[in-house]
Amino acid sequence: MLDINRIVQNPEELLSTLQKRGVVSSDIEAKIKSVSEKQRILKLEVEELRAERNRVSKEIGIQKSQGKDITEISNSMKGVGDRIKSIEEELTKEEESLHELNLGLPNLLDPSVPEGKSEEDNVLIRQWGEIPKLSFEAKTHFDIGEKLGIFDFERGVKLSGARFYTYRGLGAKLERSLMNLMLDTHTSENGYEEMWVPVLVNDESMTATGQLPKFAEDFYRLEKDGLNLIPTAEVPLTNYYRDEIIQEKELPISVCAHTSCFRREAGSYGRDTRGLVRVHQFQKVELVKFVEPEKSGEAHEKMLQDAESILQKLKLPYRVMLLCSKDMSSASSKTYDIEVWMPGLGRFMEISSVSNFKDYQARRGKIRYKSKEGKNLLVHTLNGSGLAIGRTLAAVIENYQSEDGTFQIPDVLKPYIR
């Protein structure tokens, strides 16, 4: 959700963002200007009528005190009151129309975001670690896991359908160990407060973080209850402060949570149909920050390093990519992807997205802070995966595999395995 006054005063900024994102923008600017101008005229008219009503009310009081007949002047005021009511109703409709239009607009792009058409245009920022040179043909994590009996995809399908799975024994222990490593690192070393949050949220929450109204087909909904299964803990963590005013001295606020995440993965059929890469239910540790606007750029870089720290502890090779304009989520102003090397798949795989939303989500969710000067201002929100646990486990198996079809456990995880 954008600052409409800013858009009206500088429409080129929005048009540039829409063009770079590949959004059809032929009439968006005209609609915003038309509705905004109509609002301005209606507000002016209602202010003039209210001023007239106040003036006449004073005149009625004077004439009444003088014993004069006020019937005619009182009758004239009834029409003014009816007109004010009519304009206020029309104004409410225009405000709702503008609000709905604004909800569908993407975030303005940060100036540093490269223009591009696809992931091929993303920019490499850095690469960490050496890609392992195996003396044998690398196997995939799902082949290794199934052979060792720590994954069971067949029974996952039996229980729930395609893109579901189960862990057994060491598989379940490794998932739990990775979760604990991530939470311990982020809370003890990276400065986050751990939270526990619901995985079912209302529509207001999904709207504030940008999933609604645009991406309703991408998540699971409990229609009878009016609740939605979260696609990421970003939703409840960010909405924790929805409709609230935070004191400036409390900022920055850094929180993290481990949750199950649920995604329909609509439109992804045929891609990564095997293994832990693209599934309907998975575990993830999420990082969220609330900061003052002038500090969000620095906070973004710090959050990126926090997510990277997990891969460095696990000694997994990865690269950081700055996403181009058409490969970003519509709510993000700037996004980095962390991609881990997967020997079995023979490619890098996204394992974390770290995004700066600036005031886009805060405006939708009315998340503000009171400055030292006493002004209520919008915070900037950021979030990132720290990390997706199933994908991290897949990367561990593929990078630590042996020729005999087994794999080693990273040293940093051994204290967590009992």
Curated annotation (Swiss-Prot):
Keywords: Aminoacyl-tRNA synthetase, ATP-binding, Cytoplasm, Ligase, Nucleotide-binding, Protein biosynthesis. L-serine binds at residues 232-234, 286, 385. ATP binds at residues 263-265, 279, 350-353. Its EC number is 6.1.1.11. Pathway: Aminoacyl-tRNA biosynthesis; selenocysteinyl-tRNA(Sec) biosynthesis; L-seryl-tRNA(Sec) from L-serine and tRNA(Sec): step 1/1. Its main location: cytoplasm. Pfam families: Seryl_tRNA_N, tRNA-synt_2b. NCBIfam families: serS. Catalyzes the attachment of serine to tRNA(Ser). Is also able to aminoacylate tRNA(Sec) with serine, to form the misacylated tRNA L-seryl-tRNA(Sec), which will be further converted into selenocysteinyl-tRNA(Sec). Consists of two distinct domains, a catalytic core and a N-terminal extension that is involved in tRNA binding. Homodimer. The tRNA molecule binds across the dimer. This is Serine--tRNA ligase. It comes from Leptospira biflexa serovar Patoc (strain Patoc 1 / ATCC 23582 / Paris). The lineage of its organism: Bacteria, Pseudomonadati, Spirochaetota, Spirochaetia, Leptospirales.
